[in-house]
Protein backbone atom coordinates (compact mmCIF):
# COMPACT_ATOMS: atom_id res chain seq x y z
CA UNK A 1 0.00 0.00 0.00
CA UNK A 2 1.29 3.44 -0.99
CA UNK A 3 1.05 5.35 2.32
CA UNK A 4 1.73 8.74 0.69
CA UNK A 5 -1.18 8.27 -1.70
CA UNK A 6 -3.31 7.08 1.23
CA UNK A 7 -2.43 10.24 3.15
CA UNK A 8 -3.26 12.51 0.19
CA UNK A 9 -6.54 10.71 -0.58
CA UNK A 10 -7.57 10.85 3.09
CA UNK A 11 -6.96 14.61 3.09
CA UNK A 12 -9.06 15.07 -0.06
CA UNK A 13 -11.90 13.04 1.49
CA UNK A 14 -11.93 14.75 4.90
CA UNK A 15 -11.74 18.24 3.37
CA UNK A 16 -14.67 17.41 1.08
CA UNK A 17 -16.75 15.81 3.85
CA UNK A 18 -16.22 18.79 6.17
CA UNK A 19 -17.39 21.10 3.39
CA UNK A 20 -20.44 18.98 2.49
CA UNK A 21 -21.55 18.32 6.08
CA UNK A 22 -21.01 21.93 7.18
CA UNK A 23 -19.81 20.68 10.59
CA UNK A 24 -18.77 23.50 12.92
CA UNK A 25 -16.28 24.08 15.71
CA UNK A 26 -17.42 22.48 18.96
CA UNK A 27 -19.40 19.76 17.20
CA UNK A 28 -18.65 16.02 17.16
CA UNK A 29 -17.50 14.03 14.12
CA UNK A 30 -17.47 10.22 14.24
CA UNK A 31 -15.03 8.09 12.25
CA UNK A 32 -15.61 4.44 11.46
CA UNK A 33 -12.55 2.81 9.92
CA UNK A 34 -11.70 -0.68 8.69
CA UNK A 35 -8.00 -0.75 7.85
CA UNK A 36 -8.62 -4.31 6.64
CA UNK A 37 -10.97 -3.02 3.92
CA UNK A 38 -8.56 -0.21 3.02
CA UNK A 39 -5.88 -2.90 2.75
CA UNK A 40 -8.05 -4.87 0.31
CA UNK A 41 -9.15 -7.49 2.82
CA UNK A 42 -12.32 -8.41 4.66
CA UNK A 43 -13.32 -6.21 7.60
CA UNK A 44 -11.61 -7.41 10.78
CA UNK A 45 -9.26 -9.84 9.04
CA UNK A 46 -6.31 -7.78 7.74
CA UNK A 47 -5.89 -4.94 10.26
CA UNK A 48 -2.95 -2.60 9.74
CA UNK A 49 -1.54 -0.28 12.39
CA UNK A 50 0.26 1.74 9.71
CA UNK A 51 -2.92 2.36 7.73
CA UNK A 52 -4.84 3.30 10.87
CA UNK A 53 -2.10 5.70 11.92
CA UNK A 54 -1.98 7.47 8.53
CA UNK A 55 -5.75 7.90 8.21
CA UNK A 56 -6.45 8.93 11.81
CA UNK A 57 -3.49 11.34 11.90
CA UNK A 58 -4.75 13.23 8.85
CA UNK A 59 -8.36 13.34 10.04
CA UNK A 60 -7.47 14.23 13.65
CA UNK A 61 -5.22 17.13 12.62
CA UNK A 62 -7.73 18.50 10.12
CA UNK A 63 -10.63 18.38 12.59
CA UNK A 64 -8.56 19.66 15.53
CA UNK A 65 -7.38 22.65 13.50
CA UNK A 66 -11.06 23.55 13.01
CA UNK A 67 -12.05 22.97 16.66
CA UNK A 68 -14.12 19.88 15.82
CA UNK A 69 -14.09 16.89 18.18
CA UNK A 70 -13.18 13.47 16.74
CA UNK A 71 -14.82 10.28 18.02
CA UNK A 72 -13.35 7.03 16.68
CA UNK A 73 -15.64 4.01 16.61
CA UNK A 74 -14.37 0.63 17.79
CA UNK A 75 -15.10 -2.67 16.12
CA UNK A 76 -17.89 -4.95 17.35
CA UNK A 77 -15.53 -6.65 19.83
CA UNK A 78 -15.80 -3.48 21.93
CA UNK A 79 -19.50 -3.06 21.08
CA UNK A 80 -18.69 -0.16 18.76
CA UNK A 81 -17.67 2.00 21.72
CA UNK A 82 -16.08 5.34 20.90
CA UNK A 83 -12.69 6.77 21.76
CA UNK A 84 -12.92 10.50 22.51
CA UNK A 85 -11.08 13.16 24.47
CA UNK A 86 -11.91 13.15 28.18
CA UNK A 87 -12.75 16.86 27.89
CA UNK A 88 -15.59 16.02 25.49
CA UNK A 89 -16.93 13.23 27.70
CA UNK A 90 -17.05 15.63 30.65
CA UNK A 91 -18.58 18.45 28.59
CA UNK A 92 -21.36 16.20 27.27
CA UNK A 93 -21.69 14.16 30.50
CA UNK A 94 -21.13 10.91 28.60
CA UNK A 95 -20.41 7.90 30.79
CA UNK A 96 -16.81 6.69 30.53
CA UNK A 97 -16.13 2.94 30.33
CA UNK A 98 -12.84 1.20 30.97
CA UNK A 99 -10.94 -0.46 28.12
CA UNK A 100 -7.72 0.17 26.24
CA UNK A 101 -8.10 -0.49 22.50
CA UNK A 102 -5.94 -3.13 20.82
CA UNK A 103 -5.44 -3.89 17.13
CA UNK A 104 -7.95 -6.78 17.19
CA UNK A 105 -10.21 -5.38 19.93
CA UNK A 106 -11.03 -1.80 19.03
CA UNK A 107 -9.17 -1.64 15.75
CA UNK A 108 -6.30 0.24 14.15
CA UNK A 109 -8.19 3.54 14.12
CA UNK A 110 -8.81 3.45 17.85
CA UNK A 111 -5.23 2.40 18.58
CA UNK A 112 -3.96 5.35 16.51
CA UNK A 113 -6.36 7.78 18.19
CA UNK A 114 -5.41 6.47 21.63
CA UNK A 115 -1.81 7.46 20.87
CA UNK A 116 -2.73 10.86 19.36
CA UNK A 117 -5.33 12.13 21.83
CA UNK A 118 -4.27 14.17 24.89
CA UNK A 119 -6.48 12.30 27.35
CA UNK A 120 -8.30 9.45 25.57
CA UNK A 121 -11.33 7.73 27.11
CA UNK A 122 -13.94 5.28 25.85
CA UNK A 123 -17.69 5.86 25.95
CA UNK A 124 -20.46 3.57 24.74
CA UNK A 125 -22.89 6.13 23.36
CA UNK A 126 -22.58 9.52 21.69
CA UNK A 127 -24.62 11.76 19.46
CA UNK A 128 -22.39 13.08 16.67
CA UNK A 129 -23.31 15.79 14.19
CA UNK A 130 -21.65 14.11 11.21
CA UNK A 131 -19.31 11.29 10.36
CA UNK A 132 -17.17 9.40 7.89
CA UNK A 133 -17.41 5.66 7.26
CA UNK A 134 -14.37 4.03 5.66
CA UNK A 135 -15.02 0.35 4.95
CA UNK A 136 -18.74 -0.03 5.73
CA UNK A 137 -18.38 0.04 9.52
CA UNK A 138 -21.95 1.27 10.17
CA UNK A 139 -21.53 4.61 11.96
CA UNK A 140 -25.21 5.53 11.71
CA UNK A 141 -25.95 4.50 15.29
CA UNK A 142 -23.75 7.37 16.48
CA UNK A 143 -25.09 10.22 14.31
CA UNK A 144 -28.08 12.21 15.49
CA UNK A 145 -31.40 12.18 13.67
CA UNK A 146 -32.19 13.11 10.95
CA UNK A 147 -29.26 11.56 9.06
CA UNK A 148 -28.52 12.54 5.48
CA UNK A 149 -26.12 10.50 3.32
CA UNK A 150 -23.14 12.38 1.90
CA UNK A 151 -21.17 11.11 -1.08
CA UNK A 152 -17.49 12.08 -0.76
CA UNK A 153 -15.57 13.21 -3.83
CA UNK A 154 -13.58 9.95 -3.60
CA UNK A 155 -15.83 6.94 -3.00
CA UNK A 156 -12.98 4.54 -2.25
CA UNK A 157 -9.90 4.72 -0.06
CA UNK A 158 -7.58 1.89 -0.98
CA UNK A 159 -9.97 -1.07 -1.23
CA UNK A 160 -12.58 0.41 1.12
CA UNK A 161 -15.95 1.87 0.20
CA UNK A 162 -16.29 5.40 1.63
CA UNK A 163 -19.48 7.20 2.60
CA UNK A 164 -20.46 9.87 5.11
CA UNK A 165 -23.42 11.24 7.05
CA UNK A 166 -24.57 14.65 8.11
CA UNK A 167 -27.59 15.50 10.21
CA UNK A 168 -30.34 18.08 10.33
CA UNK A 169 -33.06 18.94 12.83
CA UNK A 170 -36.33 17.02 12.49
CA UNK A 171 -39.06 18.84 10.57
CA UNK A 172 -42.11 18.76 12.85
CA UNK A 173 -45.55 20.31 12.82
CA UNK A 174 -47.14 19.00 9.66
CA UNK A 175 -48.74 21.01 6.86
CA UNK A 176 -49.24 24.18 8.94
CA UNK A 177 -45.58 24.47 9.88
CA UNK A 178 -42.97 26.54 8.07
CA UNK A 179 -39.30 25.63 7.74
CA UNK A 180 -36.08 27.43 6.87
From Swiss-Prot:
Q: Which Pfam families match?
A: DUF436
Family the UniProt entry places it in: Belongs to the UPF0340 family.
Q: What is the lineage of its organism?
A: Bacteria, Bacillati, Bacillota, Bacilli, Lactobacillales
Fetch the SUPFAM superfamilies from UniProt.
TTHA0583/YokD-like
The entry's protein name is UPF0340 protein LL0489
InterPro entries given in the database record: Antibiotic_NAT-like, DUF436
Give the domain of life. Answer: Bacteria
Q: Which gene encodes it?
A: yeiF
Amino acid sequence: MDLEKLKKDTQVIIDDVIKQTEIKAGQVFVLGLSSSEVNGGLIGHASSSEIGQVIVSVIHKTLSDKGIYLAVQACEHLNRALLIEEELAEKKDWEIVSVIPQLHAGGSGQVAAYQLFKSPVEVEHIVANAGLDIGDTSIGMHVKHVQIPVRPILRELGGAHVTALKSRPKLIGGERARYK
